Amino acid sequence: MRLRFWLLIWLLLGFISHQPTPVINSLAVYRHRETDFGVGVRDHPGQHGKTPSPQKLDNLIIIIIGFLRRYTFNVLFCTSCLCVSFLKTIFWSRNGHDGSMDVQQRAWRSNRSRQKGLRSICMHTKKRVSSFRGNKIGLKDVITLRRHVETKVRAKIRKRKVTTKINRHDKINGKRKTARKQKMFQRAQELRRRAEDYHKCKIPPSARKPLCNWVRMAAAEHCHSSGLPYWLYLTAETLKNRMGRQPPPPTQQHSITDNSLSLKTPPECLLTPLPPSVDDNIKECPLAPLPPSPLPPSVDDNLKECLFVPLPPSPLPPSVDDNLKECLFVPLPPSPLPPSVDDNLKTPPLATQEAEVEKPPKPKRWRVDEVEQSPKPKRQREAEAQQLPKPKRRRLSKLRTRHCTQAWAIRINP
């Protein structure tokens, strides 16, 4: 209602601004006898102070009209905008909505890869409407789209900032941003592991490792003779299936009778003697020895008889080896060996033999304990030491010859 009231005032002022002179003249000159305005002026001259004078009204209207003439464009623009908004409030847009969040979210979910342009959902038909030629979108839809995009971009930027902060914190400290986030992350990992374990447990044992299961089953059936490692919970299912097909093992009561009786015999008949049957003769026969059955004559009989008779010795033909065997019993004379180069090496010459005889044995090595320690020389004064005669110097050749003769003498006469 307020909008309509102000719109009517603006329209009236615009109409007056376009026709100012006739209105002013009519207000100043034209008087109705029936109106209070005209009567008050003529009939009641004492009431001029209570009512505004025509001159003041004329001056006020002139000021308003002059102000409006100066800002005519602004007034017309505001008037047109108000008219458009008024018309939009009266006539709703074809595909407008009430502005609720669920409608907005449904309105802007669009497949952008297939069609381009703005999209919305009509509240009346509940159909998706695009901005192609022939379809109209209201101003409210455009504003909603812009707000939605801004909110989405804001959330994306905020998420990126938070992620960057968390990643930097992880790189520095190796932990989550806060203790609460760290706890949530650990809880999620634990739930993920539990889900994986539950999925693994749902797989039957025979489907996990068929080859290993078969080997373990074989080891269990053969009383673990193979010595392979096995687990009972893996072989239980397979052994159960195998044992279900086999008959139950014999008990201690019927272990003796089951050897001679069939399994079809009921337990009451085990105490009473059974009637004779065909199987009795068969069981008695293996206990008695069977007579030897004569074999048919064959060609091999003559060969077997001939093998027991010793064959006469057959005379061998004379050969060259007979004379050799007789000669081996007589001892052969020693034959002289031919002279060779090694004879000189084996028989050493006379000088070498004499030198070997003359070689004296090696001197005996004395131990440290057996060797008598020579007394330490007494210290003498310098004067006494100078009085002693100096040792004579000998030539090197004489020392060598003397040393050699002493050594040879020791070797010859040990």
UniProtKB/Swiss-Prot annotation:
Presence of keyword Secreted: yes
Glycosylation sites: 111
Pfam family name, one: NPIP
Gene Ontology cellular component annotations, sorted alphabetically: extracellular region
Basic residues bias locations: 390-402
Keyword Signal: yes
Listed Polar residues bias regions: 252-262
Chain residue ranges for the region called Disordered: 242-262, 335-402
Signal peptide boundaries: 1-18
InterPro entries assigned: NPIP, NPIP_N
Biased composition (Basic and acidic residues): 356-384
Keywords, comma-separated and alphabetical: Coiled coil, Glycoprotein, Secreted, Signal
Locations listed in the record: Secreted
Family: Belongs to the NPIP family.
Name of this chain's protein: Nuclear pore complex-interacting protein family member B7
